[in-house]
Amino acid sequence: HKVVQVQGKVIPATRWWGLDITCDSVDIGLIDFWTNGFFSNPQGRAYGNLKVFGQEQQVWVLADVLGKNTQLTVPQLGSTFYFSDTIHMDSTSIRIPKLDVYDAVGNKGTFEGIITHDKFTNFKYDLNAHVDKMLVLNLPPDPQALFYGKVYGTGDLNIHGDDYNCKIAVNAKTEDKSKFYLSVNTASIATSSSFIDFVSPDTS
């Protein structure tokens, strides 16, 4: 069984070269080098065609890759998401069409986004998800962490940033069995912010 089949051509006179790569059940973990920072622990198998060609110092990539039984973890949230669908790649971006995703306990949501890059450096990403009672935060207790806990949510999530900064915007409500812990230091700082108020539940 051939996991990867490669065919290529080189034209010395013009310094042009091209590779046609067919993937058949390639370990998705190979992408960890490029996705580390916004995704971690990628797992699953990849199928599809990848064209890589270039001339002089220029390199272009075109690919449509089907990921089967794929799982990706968002390290900032500690949550792992699962899907089987096709991802599109070219020389400047990785495009994820709207696809169905599942959490570790089988709850369903949707996910889409785009990751841009400069020859696979200087990554920027804009990722969106709609979740329905999904496990969106799953961080173990850590006295050094700003927050931790296990949170199930329904609503919308946006993660955007680059190699150096990450911003997470959430418009969602928590569901049953959610437990969220905020460190004392973080709570003190947050209380002094004009846009955050901590309130006690009305027990009257």
Q: At which residue positions do the language-model features occur?
A:
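Membrane-proximal interfacial segments on either side of biological membranes
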Residues: 1-95, 112-204
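Short beta-strand segments that buttress and anchor functional surface loops
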Residues: 1, 97-104
